[in-house]
């Protein structure tokens, strides 16, 4: 047994290292930026080392467990542990955060605070994926809200205060339901609070209590995922945030809600989930079509990509609601796949904005010739977004479809309707994806403008783009790499149904 506190080190290192930024006497941005990148890279390497040498893929039980008494009066423990469900999101968090800090080079105002908030957000996002105590899960869930709010309010567009306020109202409001559900389930049936995930997983609850608590958690996770109609904060937030912040929001933050649905709603409240899963399937199907249709009507490039993220999250919701090992594995693959694709699309939209200072698609055009590298990478990522075979999104959506068909939970007519509606959404996806390419890169609007001069992607931007493209194509060719983490844990989760 390994007794070294790997997970505590991985969670604490970013925020502890970020605190040292304020001690730097150097005022230049370059030293601070590379220090931040090094902290993220060291944390990612530590995570990778711990998983490679101390994690057994064929063991569905919790591994790398840590348990330290934190508050004696409240009997509150600092509990960490991982399994096949959390290993993928943790690695995704480290990878995307490292690239996001590297992408934030144009930030020059209050750079010490900016990079500290990026590192604090890193710790706050790893925390929920590795927590094995439900109250610690809540604390970590709340910890990452503060950096996100400040990143939105201080670095963004003209309406950044409005979008930051809307974000905090939605997320803080949903956190009230999360706290009530956490305390309700932790204090049930005992004089002392029961907060350990393993203990909660082995308890049985009255169906009425299970449904009430399930709804509380569902609201909290539906805001973060997001699930319609609790999604309206997302387009405004993405439309105003700096693109490095958008990479963290699309790549990681949205996936926390989906992870919570599987980790808590499915694993702890199987009876309630069996009742609500048909509604999740219906909501997911509607979400795919609604968000894809709404994306077509957006003039703002970042808002169009944001609505495409909402649409793709619909597949994830369907996979969670299918209650089949195929569908749930597809949902987990979609978490990883869209984390890469969404982050990459927002990065490229930001690099385009740095050059043109334009976000409205009807004001763009003709960018393919002066910026061929950006055009090439954006085209490849658009193909990945519309689930082209050979890209990670193809297998994720295909396996979710197969999960619907093979699910034993639903009648044939329900399967046909869900599949038909979802297929319509998949037809809309290439329409808005190819529309972005047409409006941005084709035509002669900019190419014929007198005295126009553009810089194409530099080495830093090409490195970030290629770094994200490699796992997108790699997973598309060999998706079993992700399934090797999750398949045993998925069977353990579905054994409760």
Swiss-Prot record:
Domain of life of the source: Eukaryota
What catalytic activity is recorded?
a plastoquinone + NADH + (n+1) H(+)(in) = a plastoquinol + NAD(+) + n H(+)(out); a plastoquinone + NADPH + (n+1) H(+)(in) = a plastoquinol + NADP(+) + n H(+)(out)
Q: Which EC numbers does the record give?
A: 7.1.1.-
According to its UniProt entry, the protein's GO biological process terms are: ATP synthesis coupled electron transport; electron transport coupled proton transport
InterPro entries tied to this protein: NADH_Q_OxRdtase_chain4 (IPR022997), NADH_Q_OxRdtase_chainM/4 (IPR010227), NADH_UbQ_OxRdtase (IPR003918), ND/Mrp_TM (IPR001750)
Keyword Ubl conjugation appears in the UniProt entry: no
Tell me the GO molecular function terms.
NADH dehydrogenase (ubiquinone) activity; ubiquinone binding
Task: Please list every transmembrane segment annotated in the UniProt record, as residue ranges.
Answer: 4-24, 35-55, 84-104, 111-131, 134-154, 167-187, 208-228, 242-262, 274-294, 305-325, 330-350, 386-406, 411-431, 463-483
Q: What family is this protein classified in?
A: Belongs to the complex I subunit 4 family.
- Record-linked NCBIfam families: NDH_I_M (TIGR01972)
Q: State what protein this is by name.
A: NAD(P)H-quinone oxidoreductase chain 4, chloroplastic
